[in-house]
Amino acid sequence: MTEQGADLKRGYYLLNTDGGNSGDPLGRAAIGALLRTRRLVTVAQISKAIGPATHNVAEYQALIEGLKLARGREIQHIRVYMDSELVVDQVNGVSAVRQAHLSELHDVASNLVAQFVSFRISWVPREMNAEADGLVNDALRARD
């Protein structure tokens, strides 16, 4: 590993995630995730359709895939930003997970979170998550 690579792994990374669907309760859904250094250099991104899913399932799937992307690069410190207040509040323990299908996804996300040395997740307004939202829209358009 280069000295620069080692330095990056010691620092924290930024992960913006988003999930969405075509508007029906179980419409075509897609996820987007953007992994960057703290200097906003893009390291990796995800833009893919995930099949029929609710908006909240897509949001959780985006978080899970983004965390897997970071762990696959041996990243230890991460700051996550997403525009789903529900997912952010549930991951932070502010709100209970009341739906069984979300509970399973919450458990997967929690297990991934535990693998980081430091983790923080914060809600951001949609306009501050535009790049991740764009990745979702790209994936949805690709399937049209």
Regions found by a protein language model. Give the residues of each.
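RNase H-like nuclease fold core
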Residues: 3-57, 68-76
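RNase H catalytic domain
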Residues: 20-26, 64-136, 142
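Short, low-complexity, polar/charged sequence segments that are solvent-exposed and flexible
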Residues: 33-36, 52-54, 98-100, 139-143
